[in-house]
A protein has these predicted regions:
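TPR alpha-solenoid repeat register
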Residues: 66, 100, 104, 138, ...
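N-terminal signal-anchor transmembrane alpha helix of single-pass membrane proteins
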Residues: 1-26
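Alpha-helical segment of the N-proximal tetratricopeptide repeat
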Residues: 29-62, 76-79, 85, 89, ...
Length: 173
């Protein structure tokens, strides 16, 4: 009666040892890699930053900040079309915080501006303003957009809004 128990115990030990031996080596922690990417960005080493950011999103597909930074770097490197794809894919994610949504729409506006798709850039800024009507950057961007297009009526209107926003921000400081 003890022989079957010993055989089961030996098989169990061999199974556990095999599991741990063939288990993939633990990858570096996502946050550590993300920190390395941010450090590379600070140093101006965008290629290394992009490599680290790709590693982060391979390990954690929910790391929205890594995707945002990746898209921003691609745009800065002249690949705005790839940046649009990355940033656009983030818009369909559920349960994003407002500050993340603001960053996504800002990035998309800049992507579209670089591609000279001003109507789409405007749409993204307007979506941003729906989330935060007093966003200084968005109002200034929209003003510059209307000035580029020669739409002076809308530029005047935004200019007035911008003055109000600046007054509110000055009084809060």
């Amino acid at each position: 009666m003890t022989w079957p128990l010993i055989i089961i115990l030996i098989v169990l030990i061999i199974g556990v040892l095999t599991f741990f031996y063939f288990q993939p080596k633990q990858l570096a922690k996502t946050e550590s890699i993300y920190t390395d990417a941010l450090n590379a960005m600070v140093r101006g080493d965008k290629r290394t930053a992009l490599k680290h950011l790709r590693d982060v999103v391979k390990q954690d597909t929910n790391h929205v900040d890594a995707y945002l930074q990746m898209g921003d770097i691609l745009r800065e490197e002249g690949n705005a079309q790839a940046a649009v794809k990355i940033h656009q894919s983030l818009t369909v994610r559920p349960n994003l915080k407002n500050d993340v949504k603001l960053h996504i729409h800002k990035s998309l506006a800049l992507d579209y501006e670089q591609l000279s798709q001003l109507a789409k850039a405007r749409r993204e800024v307007e979506l941003l303003l729906k989330l935060d009507k007093k966003n200084l950057w968005a109002n200034e961007f929209l003003l510059a957009l209307f000035e580029k297009q020669g739409d002076w009526d809308k530029a005047t209107q935004i200019s007035k809004t911008l003055q109000k926003v600046k007054k509110i921000q000055d009084s809060n400081q």
